[in-house]
């Protein structure tokens, strides 16, 4: 019984440290800046996923801690309103910011690429196809009507996520 109490204390202490992540600070601009204590976005959640597990694990999905919170809160609120919609986020930046090819921005943790949510011909929400053949989704071109092969842009889902208010701290408090 004594070993169980010790194990609980160890796990509790470890958990406290894992939760006590340092907040981020951004410097400069999105085009000429850097980031301290960048936070990596999760690979996936109930209604979202990264554009590429490999690129994410290679360190291309770090953001400012406030941006991290805002994105996850927006996905959570959207999940409540649109349970069947899947979202895909793209590139964001490096853990310490700085140059981020091929982008001219994404340098201080405040830039995020969001891929459009799409539906197939049965009107089911599906993930945007991202692979090397289409430069991980960045080379996809939809028609003026939002069509690409058997996919159509889910404009209703885009409008739904735009309705939610997530109030971040002022940028002045985020950067130096």
Residue ranges and their predicted role:
Residues 6-7, 87-91, 95:
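Short, compositionally biased strand/turn segments
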Residues 1-3:
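Positively charged n-region of N-terminal signal peptides that target proteins for export
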Residues 16-20:
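Sec/Tat signal peptide C-region and signal peptidase I cleavage site
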Residues 95-109:
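Charged, often glycine-rich, active-site loop that binds/positions anionic groups
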Residues 90-94, 115-118, 176:
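Active-site-proximal beta-strand/loop segments in catalytic clefts of secreted hydrolases
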Residues 22-89, 150-175:
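Active-site acidic/histidine clusters and adjacent loop/turn architecture
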Residues 105-142, 149, 153, 157:
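Mid-length scaffold segments of soluble, non-membrane domains
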Residues 5-13:
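Bacterial N-terminal signal peptides
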